[in-house]
């Protein structure tokens, strides 16, 4: 694959994909897709992939049960943006987990309590690999692959119950 340098805009009739190449094996891994429409996640547990989900808005439904969304192994530059798409406050939780205990979240989210209090909720930065968004009324949470171990997380959650970071 050749390298190209562009001095003007790049146009695509469909999407643009960013990839990473393993320096040892030469294997190509798709990191993110730019330009595709949003992905409506199913009402159930979902294992995400970079090829299908990274770089796109992920619409989280008003679940009929607590749903767990499992991220793929972190790749620097991968981006997962979760947006609550329910039409009313949800009576269940959205849980977003990394693929394992060695992949954890750094930073946190702003919590907008529906009783008018505003605060921030932070991961511990060294082992929290799960965020539980409790009975949301709204949320917009972005998770970015920081490197091959960690995810950076930020965004906002509106609910009567604070979101919670935890170890898996």
PLM regions with names:
Residues 1, 67-70, 131:
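Short aromatic-glycine motifs in intrinsically disordered, low-complexity regions
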Residues 9-11, 15-117, 145-168:
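Exposed extracellular interaction/assembly regions and N-terminal maturation sites
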Residues 118-139:
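Structured beta-strand segments within beta-sheet-rich domains
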Residues 140-144:
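Short tryptophan-centered beta-strand motifs in secreted/extracellular beta-sheet-rich domains
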């Amino acid at each position: 694959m050749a390298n190209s340098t562009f001095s003007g805009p790049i146009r695509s009739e469909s999407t643009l994909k960013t990839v990473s190449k393993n320096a040892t094996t030469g294997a190509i891994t798709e990191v993110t897709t730019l330009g595709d429409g949003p992905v409506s996640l199913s009402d159930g547990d979902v294992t995400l992939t970079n090829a299908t989900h990274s770089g796109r808005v992920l619409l989280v439904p008003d679940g009929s049960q607590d749903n767990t969304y499992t991220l793929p192994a972190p790749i620097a530059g991968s981006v997962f943006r979760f947006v609550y798409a329910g039409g009313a406050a949800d009576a269940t939780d959205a849980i977003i987990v990394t693929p394992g205990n060695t992949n954890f979240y750094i930073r946190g989210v702003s919590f907008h309590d529906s009783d008018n209090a505003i605060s921030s909720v932070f991961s511990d930065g060294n082992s929290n690999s799960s965020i539980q968004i409790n009975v949301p009324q709204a949320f917009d949470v972005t998770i970015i692959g920081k490197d091959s171990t960690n995810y950076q997380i930020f965004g906002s959650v509106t609910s009567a119950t604070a979101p919670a970071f935890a170890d898996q």
